[in-house]
Amino acid sequence: MSILPIVTAPDERLKQKSQPVLEFTDQTRKFMDDMLKTMYHEDGAGLAAVQVGVLKRILVIDIQDHDSVARPKDFYPLFIVNPEIIEKAEELVTANEGCISLPEQRIEVARPESIKIRYLDYHGKSRELKANDWLARVIQHEYDHLEGKLMIDYLSNLKRDVVLRKLKKLKNNIV
């Protein structure tokens, strides 16, 4: 497994909509394994393919140590391909979020408290999942990436511009 390079804002790829995975191959699964290794390396809770420069509708998630629900031992990591959000709670919950593609930024985001998704798993099998609390938040955050939306898009234009300037400065100091 390889650690993949992270795409950070203001890279334009992060604003593009990802395309569905049409074929499940060993290469697809190897890529998902590489995404997972990369997410762990970055201490992330989730990662979307676009965050490693691939515009495909693939998410990996592992919040095993922070999940409020007791789940089977083999539940995590989650490999979520071509997800669709099929239900959303009306109740919104605001919480602080971070993002691997927005280093050193924390932003308050209001999201539905629970969701239900339909997706393909690691083996291409169709599944449905009801998620609430932190898992629902992480899925929605990563799903936003597939739609070309970042957590800073929930901010006012002024606040978003301030964050983008900070990120540009940070990127220039690293390179």
Curated annotation (Swiss-Prot):
UniProt superkingdom: Bacteria
UniProt-annotated binding residues for Fe cation: 99, 141, 145
GO biological process entries: translation
InterPro entries cross-referenced by the UniProt entry: Peptide_deformylase (IPR023635), Peptide_deformylase_sf (IPR036821)
GO MF terms, alphabetically ordered: metal ion binding; peptide deformylase activity
Alphabetized HAMAP family for the sequence: Pep_deformylase
Descriptive protein name: Peptide deformylase 1
Species of provenance: Rickettsia conorii (strain ATCC VR-613 / Malish 7)
Gene: def1
